[in-house]
Amino acid sequence: MVLKDLCDRIVAAKCSSKSSTEIVDNTQVPASSKAGSSDSKFPKASLWSTFFTSGFSVDETYSESSSSEKKTVHSRNSGWAAAVRKVVSGGSMRRFQERVLGSCRTDVSSSDGDIWLLGVCHKISQHESTGDVDIRNVFAAFEQDFFSRILITYRKGFDAIEDSKYTSDVNWGCMLRSSQMLVAQALLFHKLGRSWRKTVDKPVDKEYIDILQLFGDSEAAAFSIHNLLQAGKGYGLAVGSWVGPYAMCRTWEVLARNQREKNEQGEQLLPMAIYVVSGDEDGERGGAPVVCIEDACKRCLEFSRGLVPWTPLLLLVPLVLGLDKVNLRYIPLLQSTFKFPQSLGILGGKPGASTYIIGVQNDKAFYLDPHEVKPVVNITGDTQEPNTSSYHCNISRHMPLDSIDPSLAIGFYCRDKDDFDDFCSRATKLAEESNGAPLFTVAQSRSLPMQVTSNSVSGDDTRFEEDDSLSMNLVNDAGNEDDWQFL
């Protein structure tokens, strides 16, 4: 009973986060203070790794404490830790462990409906199940799917960015990290397929390691935070400053083009065209943004340098769906986008804190949180079994979907022309069901009228500010709550 109470207290402590901003390092780390720094608050991302590990030790939670602090904690607990280790290895304790970790990591119920995770449905509804075994299997499948998504968080200890003293992106880099996660999933789907899962009992896939290397924290890594900031200068990106979804999408467009020109004769590091769907080039406003089929074809032709008419395509749709909150009429539409097989989720989150939303269950939005601070790691292909644990999360977090910030961007990955045609068909149907207020529409060309129209819109771009509130500098010329910003 004492052990159970202790476990419950530890689990409750690990699962008590009430917001997406679990910032455990509130300092910016200049290059001059890189050496000798120590943080006493550095929780692991996974409850599994901090409590129920084979080498059980309480001081693992304080991995960056000073050596003297570690010795004190370890000596105080080594006696009962050895005893508990024996209990943990037992079958009854293992079942208890699974029950505790399952509730903490998923916090979902079969009564809440099915979960849609990046185009895949995990059918956990009670009426879909024939027994406890089926429920456990479905939950396990969901957990494995969630765990296999690539997590990219704040890092500290990397080389200073350009001429600045910043060796960490703590408190300002959450949108950049969220966007890295979305692009990483696109690469994962492209190279390994949507059904790929990360396993602990098999050798890691080379393609998977290649993807992680692209997102390292140095100028040598193609899609690093260093190179994103360089590519996004024209859209206001700067070291230590916050950025909005629209500028982030355009930055990826620039970075991909720069990388393509740099590797003109070699293999493309981002083997897909990028199409940012955000209104006319001359700035004309009005209605929902339009996925123009001719523009998509043009992007593919440019990417292949005219060699083939179609290539894999990454679509990014930045939107502002309200003023201080998302207009509720858009919530069902956002939910439906996760049912698209092409779904890459949403760049967004609570006001002031960008996250990467990858799934929904009714009114819940499951997300990966970039706000945990982790030390820089160097993933190389030379290591036989590289440690990639910091790129995955065993704890699934969720927030109410109607609480997300109205400034967001939706991503889709289309593998080929048939996949794009399927996306267009689904998007058109979704627009037809929107009661006149679609997220976006589809048209063959810019000269054709939009299939579905919505109210006039106006506004300025907004940026994520990583505090408790989001400063929204929106101008609502029409004075209508349903109006949203056309980017």
From Swiss-Prot:
> Its family?
Belongs to the peptidase C54 family.
Q: Does the keyword Cytoplasm apply?
A: yes
Q: Which GO terms describe its biological process?
A: autophagy; protein transport; proteolysis
**Presence of the UniProt keyword Transport in the record:** yes
Active-site residue numbers: 174, 369, 371
What Enzyme Commission number(s) apply to this enzyme? Answer: 3.4.22.-
Do you know which Pfam families this protein is assigned to? Peptidase_C54
Reactions this protein catalyses: [protein]-C-terminal L-amino acid-glycyl-phosphatidylethanolamide + H2O = [protein]-C-terminal L-amino acid-glycine + a 1,2-diacyl-sn-glycero-3-phosphoethanolamine
Q: How does it assemble?
A: Interacts with ATG8.
What is the phylogenetic placement of the source species in the record?
Eukaryota, Viridiplantae, Streptophyta, Embryophyta, Tracheophyta
Superkingdom field: Eukaryota
For this record, an example GO cellular component is: cytoplasm
Q: What function does the entry list?
A: Cysteine protease that plays a key role in autophagy by mediating both proteolytic activation and delipidation of ATG8 family proteins. The protease activity is required for proteolytic activation of ATG8 family proteins: cleaves the C-terminal amino acid of ATG8 proteins to reveal a C-terminal glycine. Exposure of the glycine at the C-terminus is essential for ATG8 proteins conjugation to phosphatidylethanolamine (PE) and insertion to membranes, which is necessary for autophagy. In addition to the protease activity, also mediates delipidation of PE-conjugated ATG8 proteins.
Question: What keywords sit in the KW lines?
Answer: Autophagy, Cytoplasm, Hydrolase, Protease, Protein transport, Thiol protease, Transport, Ubl conjugation pathway
**Protein location:** Cytoplasm
Give the GO molecular function terms: cysteine-type peptidase activity; protein-phosphatidylethanolamide deconjugating activity
This one is known as Cysteine protease ATG4
